Amino acid sequence: MRTLQKSNVKNLIMTGCPAWYDLSKIDSLKLDKKYNDGTISDSVTIGISDPALPCNKPYFYGLVNFIVRKYHNANIKLFFHRGISKEDLAKVKLLCKKYSKLAYVDLSGSAEGFKQYNQCFLHIGFRVHAHIYNLSQGNVSVLINEDARGIGVNHALGIENIDCLLKNSKVIKPSVSNQILETIVLDYLRYIEKSGYMQYRRAYKQIREYFNVAKSFIAGMI
């Protein structure tokens, strides 16, 4: 919208993304009550989604090892959205042998499989659709952006962005080290927890407001 406004297009309405709206929850969407009683350091389940871009696989496995070490009381569930390659399967099986609380899920071809994210205390990872799904459920989700889609979602909802790619670059390639990314992620997790997940509370309010705009817009077209 900002781009269009800069081009003097004035008649604009922001209706949000339909995937934000779970019609069974949207009217009362808010931060899930599980965040009132638990913390990330408790014996919870953390879901980590895989990257879409192969060049970000080192980040993914670095993040898995980091989260397992940092939150050793937690169960870790790895979500593979487009299937698991033989190479990834071999790596994941080794990780599962090394870490008894680690498991993995193949979500390819299964929209219903997304419901497994609801078993997690939080989602962290690279998949935009995982991010959007968790937000639609009132779950805390930390997206590591691979492209502009996630950046746009977070800008619209007031959630801080964490990027792993060079901006303004024609070549897609990693731009930060694993250690730097891990530090950024840890600092953000500490921040949102200390603030009582305020960014997410505001984001859910914003989603509800966008939904009301969308309803009015659709009603005006009928």
Show which residues each predicted segment covers.
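Active-site anion-handling motifs in enzyme catalytic cores
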Residues: M1-I222
